[in-house]
Amino acid sequence: KAYLSRVKWQKKSGETHVEMPLSLGKTVFSISILLTLIFSKYIYMASLNSYYTFYLIHKFGVSVQTSQICLFVFLIATAIGTLAGGPIGDKIGRKYVIWGSILGAAPFSLLMPHVGFVWTIVLSFCVGLVLSSAFPAILLYAQELLPYKLGLISGLFFGFAFGVAGIASAVLGNMADHYGIEAVYNVCGFMPLLGLVTWFLPNLKKK
């Protein structure tokens, strides 16, 4: 694992010493930014996972079967993106993957509510592919910040991600009931713009 490069073993009194790459204050700040990125990612992903089929049926009048096939295409894209995010981060750096995956999805998410059926499918595939590649990079970046708390970091980020997705599904469902399903995607389309906070993430130098 990449984060093991930051672990220094010292044979003093039989103890293992682990060096943090940043000060405690900068580490907390960086983790807060990463959680903000998880927040934006999983709100938008929840809108697609939970309501994409209803959106297609309502806006384009497609059948239930067709809408489910379109959802399957989106889910395939998310699987590919998730698998690709880690190796790409190893090659070009976690921060660059986070930049590209969160903020890079913004043009697609902003455009999707304003195009026809075919382009909606194409853009949703692009969003799924790009946005899903963020989580492996975010998780590994966080583990590099706290290499001696890998279990804590994994639990925190997975728990926060699932929690945000669950709450977002309920909130977005209520929004759809009051303002219409199209309003959900008009609003959620702006969520990837929170990727701009990646600017404040420090660069972790390889040792």
PLM feature spans:
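Paired small-residue
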Residues: 118-127
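A late C-terminal transmembrane helix in Major Facilitator Superfamily
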Residues: 143-181, 185-188
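Small-residue-rich segments within alpha-helical transmembrane domains of MFS-like 12-TM solute carriers
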Residues: 42, 46, 128-136
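Extracytoplasmic gate region of multi-pass secondary transporters
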Residues: 27-82
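Intracellular juxtamembrane helix-capping segments at the cytosolic ends
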Residues: 133-146
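Structural signature of the two symmetry-related core transmembrane helices
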Residues: 96-111, 189
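C-terminal membrane-cytosol helix-exit motif in multi-pass small-molecule transporters
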Residues: 1-13, 198-203
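Helix-to-loop junctions at the C-terminal end of transmembrane segments
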Residues: 81-93, 176-177
